[in-house]
Amino acid sequence: MGLLSILRKLKSAPDQEVRILLLGLDNAGKTTLLKQLASEDISHITPTQGFNIKSVQSQGFKLNVWDIGGQRKIRPYWKNYFENTDILIYVIDSADRKRFEETGQELAELLEEEKLSCVPVLIFANKQDLLTAAPASEIAEGLNLHTIRDRVWQIQSCSALTGEGVQDGMNWVCKNVNAKKK
């Protein structure tokens, strides 16, 4: 096989598929984030009843993102989506300080789940465009993220509305999928 045919074969190689689970409390901005990633209109978003799935191409990956509703009545069903998750993205409303304890409890429970053990986690500290938003460093400290030892993790400031910080988070995702799958 000549060099040219090898290059053609590499070029036509399909993107590596990655299963991403997008979780967080209701109104954290998960669906807005997903639509921002897919370059879709974000002006009319309603609470997710059940789930949304979108595939997004990024850096040689086909990211299959499962956006699961965050209302309290839906959260018990989250576990039905854990299987074969490559990356967990957890979205926090940085401006809703009254719910930091609740979101911290939910995240801690997710990190204890056997089916999610060792799965890299990206925490998006969303809504940074709001004046009342807590900085990512304060959220990381409040959630004791420094105690996470069984997986790689990252907290990323972002605004799903403006798109700021979203690409930085997705770059981290693509880097860590590669590291995990080697």
Curated annotation (Swiss-Prot):
Cellular-component GO terms for this entry: centrosome; ciliary basal body; cilium; cytoplasm; cytoplasmic microtubule; extracellular exosome; Golgi apparatus; Golgi membrane
CDD domains (alphabetical): Arl3 (cd04155)
GO biological process: cilium assembly; Golgi to plasma membrane transport; intraciliary transport; kidney development; mitotic cytokinesis; photoreceptor cell development; post-Golgi vesicle-mediated transport; protein localization to ciliary membrane
UniProt: Mg(2+) binding residues: 31, 48
Pfam families: Arf (PF00025)
Topology of this chain in the membrane: Peripheral membrane protein
Molecular function in Gene Ontology: GDP binding; GTP binding; GTPase activity; magnesium ion binding; microtubule binding
Keyword annotations from UniProtKB, A to Z: Cell cycle, Cell division, Cell projection, Ciliopathy, Cytoplasm, Cytoskeleton, Disease variant, Golgi apparatus, GTP-binding, Joubert syndrome, Lipoprotein, Magnesium, Membrane, Metal-binding, Myristate, Nucleotide-binding, Nucleus, Phosphoprotein, Protein transport, Transport
Involvement in disease: Joubert syndrome 35: A form of Joubert syndrome, a disorder presenting with cerebellar ataxia, oculomotor apraxia, hypotonia, neonatal breathing abnormalities and psychomotor delay. Neuroradiologically, it is characterized by cerebellar vermian hypoplasia/aplasia, thickened and reoriented superior cerebellar peduncles, and an abnormally large interpeduncular fossa, giving the appearance of a molar tooth on transaxial slices (molar tooth sign). Additional variable features include retinal dystrophy, renal disease, liver fibrosis, and polydactyly. JBTS35 inheritance is autosomal recessive. Retinitis pigmentosa 83: An autosomal dominant form of retinitis pigmentosa, a retinal dystrophy belonging to the group of pigmentary retinopathies. Retinitis pigmentosa is characterized by retinal pigment deposits visible on fundus examination and primary loss of rod photoreceptor cells followed by secondary loss of cone photoreceptors. Patients typically have night vision blindness and loss of midperipheral visual field. As their condition progresses, they lose their far peripheral visual field and eventually central vision as well.
Subunit annotation: Found in a complex with ARL3, RP2 and UNC119 (or UNC119B); RP2 induces hydrolysis of GTP ARL3 in the complex, leading to the release of UNC119 (or UNC119B). Interacts with RP2; interaction is direct and stimulated with the activated GTP-bound form of ARL3. Interacts with SYS1. The GTP-bound form interacts with ARL2BP and PDE6D. Microtubule-associated protein. May interact with GOLGA4. Interacts with GGA1; the interaction recruits PKD1:PKD2 complex to trans-Golgi network and is required for ciliary targeting of PKD1:PKD2 complex. Interacts with DNAAF9.
Family: Belongs to the small GTPase superfamily. Arf family.
Protein name, as recorded: ADP-ribosylation factor-like protein 3
UniProt organism field: Homo sapiens (Human)
Biological classification of the source: Eukaryota, Metazoa, Chordata, Craniata, Vertebrata
